[in-house]
């Protein structure tokens, strides 16, 4: 898609969603990373419901390790893949303590080396916390960006590469949240067809 069309789409999106930001609730950088790990294949609502209680007693790596995998599972059993997520969160916390003095590394390659942290999670963290122009792509961003015609891709990785190549720099910081929130608010609404989809085709 031509860049002027992409720019027009994002101008429309930014008018509908003037303050795009994560809906995950968190206290600090560590709790944000944990929330993103938990959000894989789960809703932000279900994650926030669980972390509201978790973060009262475990808001740093040491406290999470002290909580333990078994107890953590009790808090997140309503979240998808809770067994593997609990295991990864404890392993992640141990690694942060041993390798990084309980701090979260900034480098992408170090982030994705942490248990339970993949490309999407690392990109979301760098975008939201470090304010880097990373465009994290999950199933929502993949679906919406293809449906809008911004890209024509078959995988999330392909989508991220294409979006980071073609999205104007001024929109990259907010691309992830604009597309996600647009998908949640408008994709199943007729307004999506009339206000966005049809308009950009007529550009």
Over which residues does each language-model region extend?
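Catalytic cores of DNA base-excision repair glycosylases
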Residues: 2-203
């Amino acid at each position: 898609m031509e860049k002027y069309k992409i720019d027009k789409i994002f101008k429309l999106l930014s008018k509908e969603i003037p303050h795009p930001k994560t809906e995950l609730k968190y206290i600090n950088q560590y709790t944000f990373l944990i929330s993103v790990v938990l959000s894989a294949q789960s809703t932000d609502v279900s994650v926030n419901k669980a972390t509201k209680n978790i973060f009262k007693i475990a808001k740093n790596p040491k406290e999470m390790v002290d909580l333990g995998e078994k107890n953590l599972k009790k808090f997140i059993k309503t979240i998808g893949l809770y067994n593997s997520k609990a295991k990864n969160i404890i392993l992640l916390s141990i690694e942060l303590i041993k390798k990084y003095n309980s701090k979260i590394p900034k480098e992408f390659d170090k982030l994705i080396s942490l248990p339970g942290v993949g490309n999407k999670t690392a990109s979301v963290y760098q975008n939201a916390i470090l304010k880097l122009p990373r465009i994290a792509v999950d199933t929502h961003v993949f679906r919406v960006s293809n449906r809008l015609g911004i890209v024509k891709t078959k995988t999330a990785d392909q989508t991220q590469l294409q979006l980071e190549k073609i999205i104007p720099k001024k929109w990259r910081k907010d691309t992830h949240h604009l597309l996600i929130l647009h998908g949640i608010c408008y994709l199943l609404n007729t307004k999506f067809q009339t206000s966005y989809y049809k308009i950009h085709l007529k550009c």
